[in-house]
Amino acid sequence: MKRFIIIFAVFTFAGSAFIKAQDVSQLTAQCAANAGDVMYLKDFVVKLDQGTPGGAPPTARFALLLSKNVVYRFSICSAPNSDGEAVLQLFDMNTLLGSTFITATGKDYPFFDFKCQKTGVYHVFISFKEGKAGEGVGIMSYVKKL
């Protein structure tokens, strides 16, 4: 009987991990499909806790190498169970180059295109509005060569 309970617990835990992985892959596939007629290159999966009041919102940071004279598309999707809306920002050092949320207008966009002018390391930051908790995925896609 004890062995049966242990085996049942192991299968239950393994099954929940498989379902979670399946949800992330479905969200990634859906987000990549929403990017349009582009070539998928990379995904950025995030799960962030809620931020503290008055503090900086939790942010995931990813470094990537982009090539000169290439147009990239950066897309963002939030999981349905997320409290917050995901925002993707692209930086070169401290310079904001693109964002899926325009603070001045309060408008969200599902993606933005970036025309890379120089080969180098860039950083993708993903956070959730108002520091809320959430899960999401960012997608980097190839659009065309200039």
Regions found by a protein language model. Give the residues of each.
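Extracellular/mature segments of secreted proteins
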Residues: V38-K42, V124-I126
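Sec-dependent N-terminal signal peptides
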Residues: F4-G15
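Acidic, Ser/Thr/Pro-rich low-complexity intrinsically disordered segments
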Residues: V24, L48-V137, K144-L146
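Intrinsically disordered, low-complexity, compositionally biased regions/tails
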Residues: I19, M140-Y142
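Predominantly extracellular/luminal regions of secreted and cell-surface proteins
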Residues: I19-Y40
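N-terminal first-folded block
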Residues: F44-V46
